[in-house]
Amino acid sequence: MTNDEHVIEALGKTRITIKNGKITDIQEPSIDYCPIFGKYHNIEHITKEDIRKNIEYRIDDFGMCTKNRVLKMDDMLSVGISEILRSNLEQGNIDCVVGACEGVGTVLLTDPDMVQGVGGRVSGLVSTTPIKEIIDGVGIDNVLDSKKATLNPLEGLKMALSRGFKNIAVTVLPSEMIKLLREYPVDDDVNVFILVAHTTKTKKEDVKMLFDNADIITACASKNVIEYAQSVKPYYYGNSVPIYAISEEGKRLLDSRLECIGKPPSVRDYPQDLSKMARKLI
């Protein structure tokens, strides 16, 4: 059997390995409570068994990490990274998303429903291997590396630029990659929007770099991101899992999504009530 292995981080940065459509390893949960999974799955205290059931549900429900992967979906949350991207694609504020999909790696997406399907229900993707059926589903010409399913947002940005896209959103996990993306030279008529997800366990020394370079950052269960936000006071939406709009462009993208769903614009109400957030912040 060909190598088929996908590593994701879910439910508070718990690392999970899936091989040939089956869970082969679940590490210990890093947090006790996630507001999103509390709301949607009634999980008050995260255990390894809860994680197993949730990941098995995703595999069965939409074929996560398998050839049966459903790629187009409706909104999962009212406001998350995928939902923000979906609305702004529909409105023409962005024309391409450099994203990541299991079985595919880095991929260019221009279909709002596919942006939601690819990113809306899959947690942080650490590594993956090619799955032909998923690659065919997103279109092999949109895949950075169909042979290895490589994850490289910077090379994805270069690919988007080579296609002539002008308003490019890039989703990325906390890493030095964020700075490389921001510093990559582009023409004056090109805008690059950087959206950072899965920030739980971000190191204190890395947080300033995130805020200096990103347009939107999700709080997740990150103690350091949330504490830093209290000092620099960016606009945000949400009390339990805030989404911070770091730049003016980030605020425009966030507020565009909020307007689409009839919500008031982002606010700067500080200090935030940490008691409504994940337990514990790490």
Give the ranges of each region predicted by the language model.
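Conserved mixed alpha/beta catalytic, RNA-binding, or beta-rich assembly cores of soluble enzyme
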Residues: 1-282
